[in-house]
Curated annotation (Swiss-Prot):
Stated family: Belongs to the feline lentivirus group Vif protein family.
Name of the protein: Virion infectivity factor
KW Nuclease (keyword) present: no
Summary of the function given for this chain in its UniProt record: Determines virus infectivity.
UniProt KW Cytoplasm keyword: no
Cystine residue pairs: none
Cellular compartments per GO CC: host cell cytoplasm; virion component
Biological process annotations from GO: viral life cycle
UniProt subcellular location: Host cytoplasm; Virion
Organism the protein comes from: Feline immunodeficiency virus (strain San Diego)
UniProt KW keywords: Host cytoplasm, Virion
Pfam families: Lentivirus_VIF
Xref: InterPro entries: Vir_infectivity_fact_Lentivir
Superkingdom assignment: Viruses
Amino acid sequence: MSDEDWQVSRRLFAVLQGGVYNAMLYISRLPQDEREKYKKDFKKRLLDTETGFIKRLRKAEGIKWSFHTRDYHVGYVREMVAGPTTPHSLRLYVYISNPLWHSQYRPGLVNFNKEWPFVNLWIKTGFMWDDIEKQNICIGGEVSPGWGPGMIGIAIKAFSCGERKIEATPVMIIRGEINPKKWCGDCWNLMCLRNSPPETLQRLAMLACGVQAKSWRGCCNQRFVSPYRTPADLEVIQSKPGWCMLWRGKL
């Protein structure tokens, strides 16, 4: 082995600069006896990366997560949930796994970040995996349509609050079934985003009924879904959107 190759092998597992794919490609070219050793070491470092990501996530965003680990043949899958267990309460779910598992066991899945980590994110009532197709906010690190800049930041800020969040609708307010002032501004903003069409008078009216949220910026540069996002994507976390353009219709 040349000096250059030795430097590469020594540094490969300390920093994943080349990404998961390049690391596994490098391992596949090693002799058989070395391949298993380095593959085992690489998987351990992936696990350490994942654990560190989750710790930073919990600390940076202030969310009290509960989570468990499912061990599959390659790597780990973490399923995390934030929110109360009270019936009909909204909960924030996050599904994290490494792309090695998806490449081998979900070969047809193409819409995901091939680096680290793979993340799905959704908000719903009930159990984690019930009818999630319509609930996705983020699929594989890509923000879903309908969730504009700042909206994921609002979800994170709301779930940093311990108040119970429900599926509130304009009809419930009109009938007097709920009092919008009961919730803090952050929780109410999230409930409005979840249950009113974008850029409509209904949403604007719902927001006006609740407590006004205090202006804010993200507490750090934690990017939540991926360290590979662009500075423009960082706005999803750091800045909440203004409400002045939420309705463009005519009276």
